[in-house]
Amino acid sequence: MAITIYTYSNPYEINKEPYFASIQNCFQLCVSQTLVNGLCDQYKDFYKGKLTTVNRFINQLYSDWESDSVAISQRAAIDNLIEYIDFSMIVDDISSEDVITSLKRNRSDVVESIRTMFELGMELGNIKSDELSYEQKCIVEIYKELKRTDNKFFAIKKGFKEEEIDSAIDTLISDITKNVESDKIQNIRKDSIVIHGIHQFTPIMLRMIEELSKYKLVVILFNYQPDYKNVYQTWLDVYSSFEAKIVYSPRNLNNESQMFDGGKIADNIAAIIAGNTGVIDFSKQIEVTQFDNATEFAGYIAKKFEQAESLRKEDSYAHPALYYMNEQFYAANSDVNNILKIYFPEQFGERAFLDYPIGHFFLSVTNMWDPESQVLYLKDFNDLYECLSCGIIFEEKHGELVSILDKTRLFIDKETTIKGIAKRLKRLKNRIDEITENEEKNRVFQRIEYFDVSIPEIDKLIDALNELNEITKYFYDDFNDAKNDFKSFYKKIGDVLIKKVLNVEEIDSGFKEIVKRVLKRLDEVKDVEANASFDCLKETMQLYLQQIPGENRGANWIVRNFEQIDGDVLRKNRSRIAKTYHFACLSDVDMSITHKDEFSWPLDINFFEVAQAPVDWKYQVFVTSRLEYKNFRRYALVYGLAFSKCAIKLSYIKNEIDGESELYYLLRILNAKITPYEPEVDNRGQKKADYIQIDNFAMGAFDQYDLMRYRICKYRFLLESIVEEKSVYKDEFLLKKYLTIVLEHRARKYFEGKSFVRNIVFDYLNEQMDELRDTVLFVNYADAIDIVRTALAYLEKYSLYNGKFMLISEKEIDYMIKREIFLTAKLGKNANLDEKEVFKNSTQSEVDLELSEKTLNEMSYRRNLNTLCANCSEKDICLESFKSKKA
């Protein structure tokens, strides 16, 4: 093989290395796009096109193997083999059903493991099955069957001709250099291929290098610092497995690390790793910011990004937002981007089709469909919300169906199928008809949210559910859980997209353009022949339903991972803003790695070290690089600190998903000072949303109980008296409290003036509860017992005089009404001065005077945290009750 490995001592001065003249005009492959950008920024001889990423070239050279259509077919083939192979012949003492369940649950990892084995070209005769776990034996059996049958979807092209390699290079250069002069393109040499900065090799990368080396001189470059030899040892461990000599740079160029704080920290970390503690410089203490959790860290980053957006606006949007940020973030664990995507979705490139509401529709329908019973089965109620809110199901006003579903939720909550929900809604219609005809029932039940829905609204929801069933039936009518035709399924999805999206005028043109690109994508994979289980089909949706990428819509990650440090330190800061490099997530947990970081399940180091002798250099390089990933993270931190010619900041997250974590041990050894993050309090940009104002709203008539609401809280008065015109209870806690009061009042009226006999009253309460149970379906048996016992206890304590039920006076009726409206009404000695003022009675003239139309139209309906908030029917909208009084 024609492979040469060179090191360079300073990434800012590669052009001073003796070999630079021989490589500067060659076609070059980099480990990441950030390294491409950094090298092109730093060296005038480099430009995009001459330099590109390794992965982009692999996608071009191995276009079939890397295509989504092959990935889909591979998943289907493996899924069918999992069903076909008799694993009981391979694994003793474990049922085949358990094995199949395990393999299917981890289908994606299984596919990745099989692909790895094919990319490594593993020989079955060299695998020692006795040394494998039962899952690994199953994987090997699947691999063996695919090899035995020469499955066409697992055939990786090998034995390339030089013309094919040159064609792949030319095509890639042409795609990237559309705006570059043709003379420059023609001068790109293809006799030598330069590869930059790869530490984490994949098997397909190594195959590519081997193929290139048959016709080209492959020159591999990486940075090496003799002063940090223990830190850089990880690179030597990986590259020593190549069948090529490493030629070290003769230069030991001063990287001026001591001029910057980051360089001093890098020197100290390197000294610890080398065991040379005597040279550690403790003159300046390292400062580390401690974030309590990932959300707090995301909030800190979000503020920085928002400040950058403001500067960008002032600069007439001349540059991207990241250009204006005064901190550039690098994290050992970049999962915080998942939170930032919610804050700033446009920053992370074009949203995938499946991330749009209409995309959610297809995912949710698939989640709900049960292939065995052939019905839509609700495992997660949110799936139904997604289907009704996306725009596929017709509604006159956007959000109307979800609003109706919300109101009826407690009545239908126990149903598990869409058909069952539709039946339950018809039952609700009958109940509403019965209640409407009975004045007393209407008075009592109007405060329960699902009885505050109109018959036409329920009909709309039933029609929507029927339409959802029809669409689903169209998708899955000829499906079962055995072999399903993917081609037929996705053709139907395309038909629905055309009918429900492209042909609908109300949907904006921007989203229609995305749908057109999804349809184009479906057209590209329309000939994929894949038949597999329904679960496998669900997993392929991410591959099928993605749009062809739009121009200039790539992601600009706000927080970058450590693999991107090497290129970014080379970028020239052309903005007027001084940059700080912020190295984040520096905890022991985040700086270490999991087994998943090393190999896909069920493969592990034991599989590669024990099950098969490492007979091939590619095999050795791959395994070594995966095992060295932990040390690579450590190297990346030191590299970033050493070559960052700017201010630096360090931080870690204290509370992670798996519990509390500690600062990275090397920083603890250096006696780093940990300072908890204290957010700056700045309310200037916050929206004042603690009140609402209305203008020329048509007011109805008010009574003294409306005035009581007004005294309690203007915001509550607006929602209950003006908007809803009554108190409507929406959550189970308040509804159960209300039902308790209803039972108490029924008993008081029924037994008025009669002697209290506990058993008789208890039986009466149970009878009334049984009568209500058919209407209040959210109350279970245990709840009913609690409600009856609570009502009985109240009656014994407050409704008796000399062993008899008290007569109900006008004053008592007034008190009962107050309890039904406010769920509490403290009077007399039990009430404080504020409550006495709130619940005092008023004449109608007093009500009209205080609640005049002029007053109400000029009023600011402000939230007011008070002792009655916990029983407010609007508390989940207002949210004031969830605040502490101190706050």
Spell out what each predicted region is.
Residues Q42-K50, R56-Q60, A274-Q285, A308-E449, ...:
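ATPase/helicase motor core of nucleic-acid motors
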Residues K128-F242, Q290-A294, V569, K579-F583:
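Conserved helicase NTPase motor core
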Residues F27, S32, L51-F57, L61, ...:
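Conserved helicase core region in the C-terminal RecA-like lobe
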Residues Y664-G753, K818-E820, L865-N866, N871-L879, ...:
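C-terminal, charged and often intrinsically disordered regions of DNA end-processing helicases
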Residues Y738-E812:
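A non-catalytic, helix-rich entry segment at domain boundaries
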